[in-house]
Amino acid sequence: PEEAKLWANLHRGYEFISRARTVPLVGHALFGLLDAFQNIPPFYPIRNMSNPTYQVRLIDRLINKGLGAGIVAKIRTRPLPLLTSYPVPAIAADKAGYPRVYCIVCDAEISRAWVPMNPSTSRIVYLAPCGRAVMRLRSYGVPDERIFLTGFPFPKEVTGGPGLEVLRADVGRRLRALDPDNRFFPLHERNAVHFLGKSNCKKRPPAPLTLT
């Protein structure tokens, strides 16, 4: 119950600040604070960014107050590896001494909040989607032996399998749709054909407008 209240309070606070953007005078200032809180520092120059940020310290305090305690108690009843795409459960389980914790990173850009207070002593294994995410994790202090470059976790319906048939066809269609003035293809057609295939780079009649 206490953890549920904690999650509910966090959710209400986030929703309030997000919606407050439309409030005259103070709305943009409040949203600016939230935006600054979630800020990711520039990638370059590559440097050591392992020192905990305010966001990291806040997550650590909330975990000390019981955030994530419920999931830790549940997984201890059947000690299987914990695989999560959200950093808070991973950090909470690691802090509680759970031995096998895997965190799936689904973004190319990630903040310091994905990594616990003391990354060098943590046991969390990170599954990174791209080289940039790998370098971010390194700069946040995660040792190389706990970072695995696995790619983005796309379903087969999106990729089409090992040959990426569906993905290549979809990217080809999107590139043509995003280049109505034919400025991209005269410069980059050779590369597009090489990676996507000639049939996926053909000109097509305009598709009907769809709203999603």
Which residue ranges define each predicted feature?
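A conserved, positively charged/aromatic
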Residues: 75, 114-125
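A short acidic (Asp/Glu
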Residues: 93-96, 113-115, 138
